[in-house]
Regions:
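Nucleic-acid processing machinery
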Residues: 1-171
Length: 171
């Protein structure tokens, strides 16, 4: 079964890359039109992650919503020292971008999670949604600020060390 998933993921890799690129380009164009500075990264999920999720959720490959995943990281035009842990100046932009995503692509009901208003216990913050992408394929989209991304990737302790060191630390 694992090798079947591996083969299915490998067989659909180029199509998934193409679909992700279509969504990324459409979003990039709209964000530029609205002068929102953001990094948009798309990635097809690795087969082992897909297999684990299928097992855990008892779903088929086609039923998963995050086989195609895109992350939008909003960059601040504000001074980085201004960004305090609970005072991220770009938080509102996350919701603006979410509205834009839902205007560009049909949202999938029940697939929106607001971890900004309700952070996870480890202080993870992000907006998650799933939308109907090209060819009717579901696409998971995560939206967060650069500060939220840093906390998500490196943890809250690393975020504070980064803030204390200023811009001299590259993370």
């Amino acid at each position: 079964e694992f090798t079947d998933i591996e083969r299915l993921v490998a067989d659909t890799h180029s199509e998934r890359d193409y679909l992700i690129e279509q969504v990324v380009e459409k979003m990039r164009s709209e964000l530029e039109n609205r002068s929102i500075d953001a990094e948009i990264v798309g990635r097809p999920k690795h087969f082992f992650g897909i297999w684990k999720k299928m097992k855990k959720q008892q779903k088929t490959f086609e039923e998963l919503y995050d086989v195609l995943a895109i992350r939008v990281i909003i960059d601040s035009n504000m001074d980085k020292n201004y960004c305090e842990l609970n005072a991220d100046p770009d938080t509102q932009k996350c919701y603006e971008v979410m509205g834009l995503v839902h205007a560009l692509f049909k949202p999938i009901p029940g697939r929106f999670k607001d971890y900004i208003a309700m952070p996870k216990p480890n202080n993870y913050q992000s907006l998650h949604t799933a939308v109907v992408g090209p060819k009717g394929k579901p696409v998971e989209i995560q939206i967060r600020t650069r500060r939220m991304h840093h906390v998500a990737e490196y943890g809250i302790a690393a975020h504070w060390a980064y803030k204390e060191a200023g811009d001299s630390v590259v993370a």
